[in-house]
Amino acid sequence: MAGAQPGVHALQLKPVCVSDSLKKGTKFVKWDDDSTIVTPIILRTDPQGFFFYWTDQNKETELLDLSLVKDARCGKHAKAPKDPKLRELLDVGNIGHLEQRMITVVYGPDLVNISHLNLVAFQEEVAKEWTNEVFSLATNLLAQNMSRDAFLEKAYTKLKLQVTPEGRIPLKNIYRLFSADRKRVETALEACSLPSSRNDSIPQEDFTPDVYRVFLNNLCPRPEIDNIFSEFGAKSKPYLTVDQMMDFINLKQRDPRLNEILYPPLKQEQVQVLIEKYEPNSSLAKKGQMSVDGFMRYLSGEENGVVSPEKLDLNEDMSQPLSHYFINSSHNTYLTAGQLAGNSSVEMYRQVLLSGCRCVELDCWKGRTAEEEPVITHGFTMTTEISFKEVIEAIAECAFKTSPFPILLSFENHVDSPKQQAKMAEYCRLIFGDALLMEPLEKYPLESGVPLPSPMDLMYKILVKNKKKSHKSSEGSGKKKLSEQASNTYSDSSSVFEPSSPGAGEADTESDDDDDDDDCKKSSMDEGTAGSEAMATEEMSNLVNYIQPVKFESFETSKKRNKSFEMSSFVETKGLEQLTKSPVEFVEYNKMQLSRIYPKGTRVDSSNYMPQLFWNAGCQMVALNFQTVDLAMQINMGMYEYNGKSGYRLKPEFMRRPDKHFDPFTEGIVDGIVANTLSVKIISGQFLSDKKVGTYVEVDMFGLPVDTRRKAFKTKTSQGNAVNPVWEEEPIVFKKVVLPSLACLRIAAYEEGGKFIGHRILPVQAIRPGYHYICLRNERNQPLMLPAVFVYIEVKDYVPDTYADVIEALSNPIRYVNLMEQRAKQLAALTLEDEEEVKKEADPGETSSEAPSETRTTPAENGVNHTATLAPKPPSQAPHSQPAPGSVKAPAKTEDLIQSVLTEVEAQTIEELKQQKSFVKLQKKHYKEMKDLVKRHHKKTTELIKEHTTKYNEIQNDYLRRRAALEKSAKKDSKKKSEPSSPDHGSSAIEQDLAALDAEMTQKLIDLKDKQQQQLLNLRQEQYYSEKYQKREHIKLLIQKLTDVAEECQNNQLKKLKEICEKEKKELKKKMDKKRQEKITEAKSKDKSQMEEEKTEMIRSYIQEVVQYIKRLEEAQSKRQEKLVEKHKEIRQQILDEKPKLQMELEQEYQDKFKRLPLEILEFVQEAMKGKVSEDSNHGSAPPSLASDPAKVNLKSPSSEEVQGENAGREFDTPL
């Protein structure tokens, strides 16, 4: 499907399942706040889970529609009686505390007007079971999106439950349920052989499901379905065969946008199962035949819903950053009516959260009571105050009952008391507990460039949006500002939109925070609202992490800061201004950061702006007044009804990808987005009103500005018929829906005076094509039991008019050829120029002149990358070669003709892949890394040799100094020897000292040599280890890169192959058309009648040949592709096989190097030592022992060539 997620979604939604205990019934005590009377009842649920009903001691039955139930509460969350006497009456039973046995069922038509059903169970376990089961039934998404058949069954169940004490069904209930036309009801009852007087009643056993269905068929006959049934094959027989039914489902009901591999068309066996399920006549079902009755049941069955159940389920990726989602958001959540007067309600927070909202607003003000408890209210208005603590408790109670994904608390903090702000923070910590996100997640630090965590990462967490205290300001100045805070205004000001141009704020009367433009703030309008909120204390500031409100300066500034945890709020007028001036920049901003839009202050009646405006810009928190159910709120409910009603909807891909730029005002097709064509035909309506009035249906489309069409279509008004009006009108066609993933279709029914009956909002991407019932809903999006509209929808990928003929020719060549011939004949008959037509057809120049035109209009030619790495070999015969004028070419054999157009395609070799730019670039990078590594080790070696040379010089100088001293002493001794009295033993002592000095010198040099040798060995080993590790990593990276390059090139080759296939088909058709032209030329010499006969035969045989040749060509192309794919696999495997081979070679190479290394170092040191000692001997500075047997020590600093030695030829090698 266009834009669909890859893979088939496994449905997680659970069907309605009513437990036995709810079916059998349980004893409860029912009580009311305004009465001290308690009523023992037996409470039950019908087996289908439609109604909650109870019978009192007088056997009178009351019903509660489960679709109206909002919540079920027990224990401390349930309502408790205030009257002590009433409490005493209720304290019955001996198992468990009274509080734990209390149940409150909350129900109502909308969020504001709610009622309570208060019950007391006799056991705690029973109270818990019923609470959980009732809440589960009331929030079941499949129950909220039932099939048409299920709604009709619900009406039947209601009639069966509302019986007299004798167990009979009063006919007045039937007349009341189908009140639009009493005469029709009377006639339908008579057709079922039932009494028709309003005061009569009938036994339940006489009103079976089959009788009820016959009654409905008579009350609401469906001639339009009979026509569809006949048109699709049942003209001469009263049934459809399994093949006809299969064609109907696959051709009419199947979505052509679906991938045929993931969502294959139905097969005979599957269709047979459907026939057996819906066909009431078992003998027909066994034969694979479906009657019109079975066909009607199938159309109203669960398999034929207008929206796939997978779209209702949680089917979107929830692991992307928070900024990539639209988030269901509420404005001034506590209000139940207008913005200036009315009651504030704690219950509104529960109701809004239960409805799927994930972002609520808390306008906090300083409490004026002695307890100094902060309150929530709309400042400087006549709205009432509610307790901040009670609101926090309500949020904690209902935060995650319907969705596990994070709650965002948008604080508008006007509390200018540090003590009360500390209380607020304490309540949040204590009541929310571990659910409150106090610290940022380890994976997502509050740093520039780091994206926000995902809804999946933040499951069951509550995040606070409040002003963050600036650490720059001192504590004293903070307190001073806090005490001086003037509470003369109220605003969202969790973040403030600050005009980027001077004077912009003064020129606009709309302020930047919630309700800043209210009339009671005239004095502060010009000043803006930057200081309208109180300074955040340390306690409140510590609660803020991922949602830090900041003043908006410009999109450029936000981009430079690149801090995803900073967000800004925009009043709707400022948001619209930015959207108009900088649409692309607004979308870019919303890819990384959150933005919140809220209604302008002049909407004192709590009306709403259209949220679609800001969804188009990717704004996440588009906050609305939930208490007002206008069109804008209906669109919002339609948006968040899907994806498991989680409150989060993944934005379209182009609004998330950093490499794509999206303009919401685009009018043309966006590259990469598959546009849709949508056609809607309103066929008929059923039970649209309970009055005998005329009705009509309107169709709207909402989406991007180019896609939006308000009141795009309106049917004629039916004449006094609300039961089964039929509209035979042309369908409304939305030719090009540019962004289907953000577009929705609204189908609404009205009475002739314009009174709203019901509607349904359907995402374009989720709509199933075909014949469907649209079960209508009321303003609050609650399903209506009987009203429905029967429609026929066509939806497909958009094809521009330019390519329509080409698409048709490629998809159905036979029909296309026939159509072309038919048009030619019609034109010839019209102009009476048969001879000229034949002459034109016979002219070979005509064919060649058409070729360029065909090439220009071929879609496959557009946007093709001709530099793609594909090396097709030229065919043996040039495709455009023409025979000599007048000559007739003999018909070619099938294989020869196919081979003449078939291009040989060869897979790229590994060596060719290695020449790809990205791979060569990586090799160069590795070359540089190895070069740098060797250079670093060369430097270390040079330094080591210099160090040893210095040491040698020190030893040598010490030796020379000490030897000189001994020789000097020896000279003195020789003078004394010349005296007769001096002893002779002095010379021998000096010789011994010199010998000892020589021995000491020799030993020092040997030690120095050993040390140098060991250090050089260690250094070279370290170099080899580094080289080996580096090369091992290079092998991994190069193999991975080569694999990626291979996959990319091979994918490009396969894409190019598709284009080649299309060109080959065209070439084949061209050649065959040329043969046909030659045959026509041959027939020119014959008389006209014979020529016409031969021409007709030629056309017939030509069509057959074209089909056969194309089929054989496709087979040859398929084999070629299989061979190419197999070769691709082989090459990828060869690449993978190179990795262990290269690693083994690397291991062996360095094993050999390590083995040779000690000897190489020894030889290197010996050679160096020989030269040094020889040099010193010539100068007489070497010890005599070394002069005769020099020690092998490196005593000089070699050149870089000497140091690198064997590395010179290999140091910059790369493994591949």
UniProtKB/Swiss-Prot annotation:
Residues 469-534, 834-891, 967-989, 1072-1095, 1172-1216 are annotated as: Disordered. Highest expression in brain. Also expressed in parotid gland, liver, uterus, lung, heart, adrenal gland and ovary. Not detected in spleen, pancreas, intestine, thymus or kidney. The receptor-mediated activation of PLC-beta-1 is mediated by two G-protein alpha subunits, alpha-Q and alpha-11. Residues 507-518 have a biased composition (Acidic residues). This is 1-phosphatidylinositol 4,5-bisphosphate phosphodiesterase beta-1. Residues 491-501 have a biased composition (Low complexity). Interacts with DGKQ. Residues 540-656 form the PI-PLC Y-box domain. It holds the Pfam family PI-PLC-Y. Keywords: Calcium, Cytoplasm, Hydrolase, Lipid degradation, Lipid metabolism, Lipoprotein, Membrane, Nucleus, Palmitate, Phosphoprotein, Transducer. One of its GO terms (biological process) is positive regulation of myoblast differentiation. Transmembrane segments: none annotated. Residues 846-868 have a biased composition (Polar residues). Palmitoylated. Palmitoylation at Cys-17 by ZDHHC21 regulates the signaling activity of PLCB1 and the function of the endothelial barrier. Palmitoylation by ZDHHC21 is stimulated by inflammation. One of its GO terms (cellular component) is nuclear speck. It comes from the Eukaryota. Residues 656-784 form the C2 domain. Residues 472-483, 967-979, 1075-1095 have a biased composition (Basic and acidic residues). The keyword Membrane applies.
